[in-house]
UniProtKB/Swiss-Prot annotation:
Protein name: Centrosomal protein of 170 kDa protein B
Compositionally skewed regions (Polar residues) per UniProt: 421-434, 454-479, 1005-1023, 1129-1150, 1216-1227, 1564-1596
Domain FHA residue range list: 23-73
Family: Belongs to the CEP170 family.
General function of this protein: Plays a role in microtubule organization.
Matches recorded under InterPro entries: Cent_Immune-Sig_Mod, CEP170_C, FHA_dom, SMAD_FHA_dom_sf
Lineage, broadest ranks: Eukaryota, Metazoa, Chordata, Craniata, Vertebrata
Species in which this protein is naturally found: Xenopus tropicalis
PANTHER family for the chain: CENTROSOMAL PROTEIN OF 170 KDA, CENTROSOMAL PROTEIN OF 170 KDA PROTEIN B
GO CC annotations on file: cytoplasm; microtubule
Keywords: Cytoplasm, Cytoskeleton, Microtubule
Pfam families according to UniProt: CEP170_C (PF15308), FHA (PF00498)
UniProt superkingdom: Eukaryota
Subcellular location: Cytoplasm, Cytoskeleton
Stretches the record annotates as Disordered: 136-201, 329-369, 415-504, 566-586, 637-659, 719-739, 758-842, 1005-1084, 1100-1341, 1379-1405, 1443-1463, 1560-1628
């Protein structure tokens, strides 16, 4: 065609056609791009004035200007261009002349929207038609010209309206097909009128598609089109689109398009990727334009057009691309198929995760069920029918498949077509199904998107209804269409009314048109589709659908649902498909009923945040969710959790139901509970819980089975045993949904309000006796509570209940619970998980709904239930801690009854159930699970302790004492069975934020104390009783928090049984341990109950230091009084404190755990724990304080003063520290909230302050202040160790300390030595360090004041510690000889007394310490004994200096000032002793050897002066070869010795080389033997710490050799061999 156009002809002859629109001229991203750097990025614009038919140029304020006829034009002003005007932009070498040229343009190019707009050609007719059609479609272009211009502009405005190309493709993209179909002009007319058609035409033309096929003259131009956006094989793609088929079907499409232009535009615009979507028929897509075009019209066009085969390959490529980039395809994978996104580590849960569309495996509460429902319904009701329709009724197929004409294109290339369909999202079902690869891809993507949307739909009937509305209009945007389809089917199958209720912005537009055209097209293509795509599509559809839900059971149910839904939907789908047509070609999901979509999106968001309330999610999601998805009945489940779930459960999770519990019953139970708790349980959280829970299913199941055959239990068991999916949800440990305490809190509060603490205690005492007998019922109740499976607290509480029952019947409980523990390594967690799993409804923590209703109603233990109500309230606050702490709290509660009745174990378990967050923290919920974010362990502790506040003072004291004793025993047992305990009761409980790491490190003792409580519930409870009796005087809250931590520790160290009979001893020992191993735990306790630690610390101090029941009794009385005041005070301030404790403890436990972990890794935390464990080991069953019992009288010498001193030192939060009633009450009252803050804000300062106290003795009142500080310091293991030290020191029995606490002082000193090299001998320096630290902490006035109060105590403690240091030094040597590594451990931190238990106490830290000690000792040049000991201390010390951040920093971070002085002092003492013993003789020997060697060297030089051997050369050579860096050591003497020995070594090597350069001379065998003996014995002696004796026993020469060799070895790399040098030295 001849067309006249305006051109800019450059001086180089290049012609640039000026379109009838504004174009930019510049260097970047401009229509006219110039290369000159003098041209701005956007230099000028050339606009077209259609009225005057002239072009105007405007300079955009460019730097170098625009010149017209060599005259610079003003900026920002249009200048009219005339023919032959000379234009220059900037200083570009090219000048442009405006010319009007007549040129030939192929029709195809004319059809090209952009090209035609640029050219004035006979497209006006088409333009007019387009204009009309555009108007019909509400196009933004008013005139054909404007439309063309807009098209030229890539129809950016049209794109959104018409579903224009998704990726910036011009609006004409894909219009080739339309033009091709009705190329005569209708297509062109419609092209602009109906953007989709136009796009199709343009696409075809541009891509060489059907238009060219349609008009064979244009067939020549397929590639003639103006190179534009996508000159990709769109033509090819379109051409292979089964031209006959396409043409045939596209004719109706075009007709349909012509009838309802609005619908076609969407379709075509949808074909952003050269994919033509039939505007009329959503199910029709022409892949030729990248399969983007849906269009049945394309099909029709294809029918008209010659069927190009090339198109198929292009389509395939495009289809692949679409599959990869098509959200519908992503949507394709049903929840069942979501295997790709195992949202978690457990592949077992893949099916469970099927509903989870998040790759991390998480899923909103609504998400999972929604996905399941939409998937099921889509796949089950509609998709199967759609498949059938696709195979049988093109209309239905299109309707159901969202205009996936690609399937129909399957005639040419069914899989490819299906890919195109997958692109459409409608094709997802048939197309993806047919194409496994595409299907997988699509399903993955769809799984993500669709799950999100479907999840939202599943959230409520309304959401699915809205989605289903969009779903009938499958042609809607591919993403939304697919989702809509799924949702539609979901809603249509379960709620047929929803289908008609679908609201799509485009429903009115495309529904009818899409349906009608789809019917026509489908009928036309029925044969083709049936032949090529029917079987594959039907199969794939059903398969994919089935796969999504877990095609097993749901296939049949899907078929049924399909039939029902498809029947209902068929009519609706047609109507909706008309709407779908508007969405058919677009990914935009907006076309769906936006209102509903918005609602669904909001629902999804709510679900993500756990707000969504979906029984299906909570229960079915966890237990039957996947099956529900498969059945496609999830939506009904949403509406009728019990009814829909039952069928689904029965069909889908028959395995789960294998227990005999009807699926119906299971569903009902889960449904009811899930409704209550699921609101806050995110779907993803439930899923997360469920899949991790699958692993621990068997233990839980066994426990459940053993305990009860309850339906819920059966469900839980079945879910766990039968299917991971069901199990996963039930045990879901995802606590994020727990965050909202709204659901749980009310119930918890109800329980709390319903029952008073006193009544709880009493009822606990009574029911506790029954609990062991009623374990089954308890578990049943717990299982009932489990519906809040998400609520770990609920599970924990349940677990705790069982634990407490077992605590009464400890063997029974431990057997059941430990069995669970063995299964999941988290007995407490697992137990809690069992109820949680049983209650698949991860609604929230059972304590909320079930405790209030189920518990009270179901439990025979009404009193226990009552008790649990208040405790649960506390737990709710302490939610995170509840799981782990509940056992502790339970212990505390039980301990009270133990004292009274000898058994009290269940109240706290209820409390645990009560936590607002359902703490699914059970063994089932492994560390893999999300931590209980909602339920903070500290909060739990606070709640528990607060609930226990009402207990009698005596009970508190007893609990505290018992806890102290148990703490010591637990410390010992913990070290012994730390690994086993970790396995049995992994510290990974979600309650503790860092449970995983806790398990691995010695610091886990404190952290795991909460978690391990279940295992050691009895023991811990006993200790807790003792400890809490002391601490209860100060503050029940704190006591319970403290006992909770201790109980956790004891449970963690559950191997150590605590006998109430050993309470007195345990008091001392527990206190010692609270100062000792409990030190680290103290931090946790304090962290958990910030205010509590203070009192407990004082009690611990009193116990440790007093070690006398009399002191305890006296303190108990004051504490009892204090407790009364404190209890009332805490009852009022309890909430505030709990809140503070929550916020503070939330952060506190983590730092504590972190510091503990660090210390454990550095060997410090473990050392502290080891020290505590040592004490425990020393006096585990008996008065486990060997020295404590022996020296209890001594310790009681200065009960008040020592206690005061000890309290500040134990401020780190030793469990029994709060021994002074006044200090406890005032401190706890004062610092309950503040101390936590202090501990958080100034752990270091607090620690420093703790150390500082030795400076200034202060009255007990001041002591109270230090005590809070000690709570802050509680974090530091050093403070803990110091507490221990203080305990013994305050006892004024350094010998006692050595005996029972000796390890602790030793540890402290060792740690201090490791941390600092300051001479330990100077207690003044230590006091100065506390003073300086005190100054540092002066910033914190309270802490400082407290520290001042402590400083006096610390000063005395320092004096006592000096004695202890001496004892420690001697003991260290003894220990080194006996248990060499143990001392090094103690030196490394807590374990100077590791000789007995330090090594076993902290396995990890001990091992590392030992290893390091051994290495260091080997490297050390001191005599072996001293070397071993010093390396041990210096090992840790060097460990600290080189890695000071590691050990010292952690230690000091926790007890900064304090550890430094004690460490330095201890280290200085030991080093002084050892150095004096070893370094002096060694130094002397080294000097002598060096001098002798120098003389020998000079003589040798003279002797060999005239020889041919060059002494200097050899010496230089050897020196260079032997250049080994000298080990850095804090001891200058050692360094000098090493240097001297190295020099001697080199000189000897030189002499040896000179004398026997060739090496022919052989040293006498005797010498060799001697030398080797020396060499061998030296390392051995170093290793065994007997090197000193051996060295002494050996000849001076040997000693010299040894020293020389030792220095060489130490200076050289460990592997370096000095045998030659040694021999030489020996010879010399």
């Amino acid at each position: 065609m001849s067309v006249t156009s305006w051109f800019l002809v450059s001086s180089s002859g290049t012609r640039h056609r000026l379109p009838r629109e504004m174009i930019f001229v510049g260097r970047e991203d401009c229509e006219l791009m110039l290369q000159s750097r003098s041209v701005d990025k956007q230099h000028a614009v050339i606009n077209y004035d259609s009225d005057k038919d002239e072009h105007r140029v405007k300079d955009l304020g460019s730097l170098n200007g625009t010149f017209v006829n060599d005259v610079r034009i003003p900026d920002q002003k249009y200048i009219t261009l005339k023919l032959s005007d000379n234009i220059r932009f900037g200083y570009d070498i090219n000048t442009y002349v405006l010319e009007q040229i007549q040129h030939q343009v192929p029709e195809e190019a004319l059809k090209h929207e952009k090209y035609t707009s640029h050219l004035q050609m006979c497209l006006k007719t088409a333009a007019a038609g387009r204009e009309d059609q555009f108007k019909e479609h509400g196009a933004h272009v008013d005139s054909a010209q404007a439309k063309q211009d807009k098209a030229d502009k890539k129809a950016t405005s049209d794109i959104p309206a018409y579903r224009t190309p998704l990726y910036g493709q011009p609006s004409w993209w894909g219009e080739d097909d339309d033009n091709k179909l009705d190329k005569e002009g209708r297509r062109q007319d419609e092209h602009y009128s109906e953007r989709p058609n136009d796009m199709t035409q343009h696409e075809e033309e541009i891509n060489g598609n059907m238009s060219y096929r349609d008009s064979q003259d244009q067939c020549v131009y397929p590639f003639r089109r103006e190179p534009s956006y996508f000159e990709i094989p769109t033509k090819d793609f379109q051409q292979p689109v089964k031209p006959p088929e396409t043409q045939v079907y596209e004719i109706p499409t075009k007709d349909t398009d012509a009838v309802p232009p609005v619908t076609p535009p969407v379709m075509q615009s949808h074909a952003s990727f050269t994919i033509e979507f039939d505007d009329c028929q959503p199910g029709k897509i022409k892949i030729k334009d990248h399969v983007t075009k849906f269009s049945m019209r394309q099909r029709k066009t294809a029918g008209k057009e010659p069927a190009p085969t090339e198109m198929v390959s292009a389509e395939s490529k495009v289809a692949d691309w679409l599959v990869q980039n098509d959200p519908s395809l992503i949507r394709r994978p049903a929840p069942g198929e979501d295997v790709y996104s195992t949202k978690s580590d457990l592949p077992i849960h893949n099916r469970t995760l099927k509903g989870n569309r998040h790759e991390d495996g998480t899923q909103s509460d609504s998400e999972d069920p929604l996905v399941a429902q939409p998937e099921q319904e889509i796949g089950t009701p509609d998709h199967p029918q759609l498949q059938r329709q696709i195979k049988r009724e093109p209309e239905e197929l299109l309707h159901n498949q969202q205009a996936f004409v690609i399937q129909f294109f399957d005639d040419d290339d069914a899989p490819r077509k299906k890919r195109s369909q997958s692109f459409t999202h409608n094709a997802n079902s048939p197309q993806n199904d047919t194409d496994p690869v595409l299907k997988a891809k699509a399903e993955k993507r769809k799984g993500t998107l669709h799950v999100e949307k479907v999840s939202t739909n599943g959230m409520g009937s309304t959401a699915p209804a809205s989605k289903s509305l969009s779903s009938p209009s499958f042609p809607q945007r591919s993403n939304s269409f697919r989702r809509e389809k799924t949702e539609d089917r979901i809603s249509s199958a379960p709620t047929t009314a929803k289908l008609p209720g679908k609201n799509y912005g485009s429903v009115g537009k495309k529904s009818k048109l899409a349906q009608e055209f789809a019917a026509e097209y489908m009928r036309e293509q029925v044969e083709v589709v049936k032949q090529a795509a029917e079987k594959p599509m039907t199969l794939p559809l059903s398969t994919s659908i089935l796969q999504q839900p877990a095609s097993q059971v749901q296939i049949s149910s899907q078929a049924q649902t399909m039939q029902l839904t498809s029947d209902v939907r068929t009519g609706k789908v047609k109507n909706e498909e008309e709407d779908n047509l508007s969405d058919a070609g677009t990914y935009t999901i907006e076309t769906e009923t936006q209102d509903r979509e918005v609602e669904q999106a909001r629902k999804m968001i709510d679900q993500v945040f756990g707000v969504f309330e979906s029984d299906e999610y909570s229960k079915i999601a966890s237990t039957v969710y996947r099956p529900v998805i498969k059945l496609g009945e999830e939506e009904p489940l949403a509406s009728e959790p019990s009814v829909p779930h039952k069928p689904i459960m029965s069909s889908t999770p028959p395995v789960k139901l294998s227990n005999g519990l009807p699926a119906e019953t299971l569903i009902e139970r889960t449904g009811s509970s899930s409704k209550q708790s699921q609101k806050w349980v995110s779907r993803w959280a439930s899923l997360a819980d469920s899949y991790p829970d699958a692993s621990p299913t068997s233990p839980l199941d066994s426990q459940k089975q053993g305990l009860i055959a309850d339906d819920e239990d059966v469900i839980e068991r079945t879910e766990h045993q039968g299917e991971a999916d069901p199990t996963v949800p039930s045990r879901t440990r995802r606590l994020l949904p727990q965050l909202p305490p709204e659901n749980v809190m009310p119930t918890i509060f109800v329980c709390q309000e319903s029952f008073s603490d006193e009544s709880q205690r009493k009822s606990l005492e009574e029911p506790e006796k029954r609990i062991s007998e009623e374990n089954s019922s308890l578990l049943l109740v717990q299982e009932e509570l489990d519906p809040d499976s998400l609520s770990d607290t609920s599970k924990s509480d349940d677990g705790v209940i069982s634990v407490r029952k077992s605590a009464k019947a400890s063997n029974t409980y431990r057997n059941g619970w430990k069995g669970e523990e063995s299964h999941s390594r988290e007995p407490s967690v697992q137990r809690t998980s069992v109820p949680s799993n049983e209650k698949k409804s991860t609604c929230f923590y059972v304590g909320n709904d079930d405790v209030g209703s189920v518990k009270q109603t179901s439990f025979g233990l009404s009193s226990k239930d009552v008790i649990k109500g208040p405790e649960s309230h506390i737990k709710m606050k302490v939610n995170l801690h509840i799981t782990a702490e509940t056992p502790s709290s339970g212990k505390a509660v039980n301990q009270f009854p133990k004292k009274d009745n000898g058994s009290a174990k269940d109240p706290l378990s209820f409390v645990r159930q009560e936590s607002f967050t359902k703490e699914t923290s059970s063994s089932n919920v492994l560390p893999n699970k999300l931590p209980h974010i909602s339920t903070h362990p500290l909060l739990k502790d606070l709640s528990v302790t607060k609930s226990n506040h009402d207990y009698s003072k005596e009970t508190r004291l007893i609990l505290k004492e018992t806890e102290t004793a148990l703490a010591a025993l637990e410390a010992k047992l913990f070290t012994q069975s730390h690994l086993d305990e970790i396995e049995n009761t992994p510290c990974l409980r979600d309650d503790s934020l860092s449970g995983d790491s806790d398990v691995d490190t010695a610091s886990t003792v404190s952290l795991v104390s909460d978690k391990n409580v279940p295992s050691h519930s009895q023991k811990n409870r006993i200790v807790s009783l003792q400890k809490e009796k002391s601490s209860s005087t100060s503050s029940i809250q704190e006591q319970y928090c403290q006992p909770s931590a201790r109980e956790r520790l004891s449970e963690k160290r559950r191997t150590v049984p605590a006998d109430a009979g050993t309470r007195n001893v345990t008091k001392r020992l527990g206190m010692t341990r609270s100062t000792g191993a409990r030190g680290s735990l103290d931090f946790t306790d304090e962290e958990r109950c910030s205010s509590l630690p203070y009192m407990p610390v004082s009690e611990t101090v009193s116990s440790d230091y007093e070690h006398s029941s009399s002191r305890h009794i006296s303190r108990r009385k004051p504490f009892g009084q204090t407790c009364k005041d404190e209890s009332s005070r805490s009852s009022n301030a309890q909430k505030v404190q709990q809140a503070l404790t929550r916020s503070n403890s939330l952060s506190t436990p983590r730092p504590t755990r972190a510091s503990k972990l660090r210390r454990a890794r550095l060997g410090e935390s473990s050392d502290n724990e080891s020290a505590d464990v040592e004490r425990s080991n020393i006096s585990p069953g008996t008065s486990s304080a060997n020295s404590s019992s022996a020296k209890s009288s001594t310790e009681t010498k200065k009960p008040s003063r020592l206690d005061i001193l000890a309290m500040p030192r134990k401020r780190a939060g030793s469990f029994n520290v709060p021994s002074d009633s006044e200090t406890t009450s005032s401190v706890r009252g004062m610092f309950s909230g503040r101390s936590i803050d202090q501990s958080y804000t100034s752990r270091k300062p607090a620690v420093a302050e703790s150390k500082q106290p030795p400076k200034k003795p202060l009255p007990p009142t001041q002591k109270q202040t230090p005590r809070p500080r000690s709570s802050s310091v509680k974090y530091s293991s050093s403070s803990t160790s110091r507490r221990r030290q203080q305990g013994s020191d305050y006892v004024s029995t350094s010998e006692e300390e050595c005996g029972s606490n000796h390890s602790t002082p030793k540890h402290k000193h060792s740690r201090a030595s490791t941390a600092t090299q300051t001479s330990r001998s100077s207690s003044v320096s230590r006091r100065q360090m506390p003073n300086s630290r005190q100054d540092e902490e002066e910033d914190e006035q309270e802490v400082y004041n407290n520290f001042m109060a402590q400083s006096v105590e610390i000063a005395e403690i320092a004096r006592l510690s000096q004695t202890l240091v001496k004892d420690v030094a001697s003991l260290a040597r003894e220990i080194h000889d006996v248990a060499g590594d143990g001392d090094s451990q103690s030196s490394s931190g807590t374990g100077q007394s590791t000789s007995i238990s330090s090594v076993p106490n902290t396995p990890a830290s001990t091992i590392s310490a030992r290893e390091e000690i051994i290495k260091r000792s080997l490297q050390r040049t001191c005599s072996s004994q001293l070397v071993h000991h010093i390396p041990e201390a210096s090992l840790n010390y060097q460990k600290i200096p080189p890695g000071s951040t590691g050990l010292e920093d952690f230690d000091q971070n926790m007890n900064d000032s304090r550890e430094d002085p004690s460490k330095r002092r201890a280290r200085n003492i030991e080093e002084v002793i050892f150095d004096n013993l070893m370094l002096n003789p060694v130094s002397h020997l080294s000097h002598t050897i060096c001098a002798n060697t120098e003389v020998l060297t000079e003589k040798m030089k003279i002797l060999f002066q005239n020889t041919e051997k060059n002494w200097e050369e050899i010496e230089a050579k050897i020196n260079s070869e032997n250049e080994v860096p000298i080990l850095k050591t804090s001891n200058k003497e050692i360094s000098s010795i090493l240097k001297e020995l190295r020099r001697v070594q080199k000189q000897l090597e030189v002499i040896n080389a000179i004398i026997d350069r060739s090496g022919h001379l052989d040293v006498p065998s005797s010498n060799k033997k001697t030398s080797s003996t020396i060499l061998t014995s030296n390392p051995l002696s170093r290793t065994t710490n007997n090197s000193a004796a051996r060295t002494e026993s050996q000849t001076p020469g040997h000693v010299r050799n040894y020293m020389h060799k030792s220095s060489s070895s130490s200076s050289r790399s460990p592997g370096s061999s000095f045998s030659r040098d040694d021999e030489e030295t020996y010879i010399v």
